[in-house]
Amino acid sequence: VTKDGAETDLDLGHYERFLDLELTQRNATLAGRLLRDLIADERAGKFGGQTVQLVPHLTQAIKRAIHQAAAGQVHIVEIGGTVGDYEGLSFVEAIREFSLEVGREHCLFVHVVYVPFLATSQEYKTKPAQNAMADLRGFGIMPDVVAVRTEGSTAPPRGVADKIAIASGVRPEGIIMMPNVDTVYKVPLMVARELGPVLASFTGNDTAPDMTRWQQLARHDSQTYRQRLTIGLVAKYIDNADTYLSITEALKAAAWAHRSEVTIQWINAETVTDAALSTVDAVVVPGGFGKRGVEGKIAAASYC
């Protein structure tokens, strides 16, 4: 939920935490909302009787949304889904047109692909990634960087990257391997190390970024502290913990500042009991929608 009350994709919360920004509903562009606005404009006669089409009308709306959301020196645009998905074609076309309008030298295309590892044959399979990149080139977009997601904690041999570089036409330094890490806060460190030369060339700034705070975050998340705190989270939507991800991540950061380890104990807002509240060190009562669980939240606040 953004500061202006919009319910958006979970990814927007990651951007807020990692970039230390407050985002709004303008930063989340949804096809359904754009189509609704297009239909409303057509019904109001704003197109003068023209036939409203995905190209150019929807693509123009997407480009306008990108411009309206842009407020910084660097603007990050993420297109969800998979290359070739029918529902995402208008967004791919819009971003192609966008790069031509602002200048190709001002755009850096990053394509994330998945390279599976087959345990039976003990080899990485790059064919799905090659096909995805061929599809992307077919839409008129040549990636500058290919981020290769793989399973396991070790990166594939360099031969895999070389194979992808040859098949895609991307420079070898533009192929970055992204294996699993034990904490998400190590990802910026990995990207800065692997992608530094490409970003320096793109931005014209070869000054190495100060990654001290990221190193501290990664160290905190990997470290085990002796002092432990149990926080009771009185929640309505306990079936999906990601609903409260911003809160749980904030609690972790607060605990790290006090060199402590935090354990989240989920308490159903509809079945709050004194016994459940008595076992925790502190209670957090987050916001919610509707009447369900309100009495339990009030009871939890009263207990404290």
Predicted regions and their residues:
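Flexible phosphate-sensing "switch/lid" loops adjacent to ATP/NTP-binding sites
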Residues: V1-T263, E270-A282, G288-G290, G296-Y303
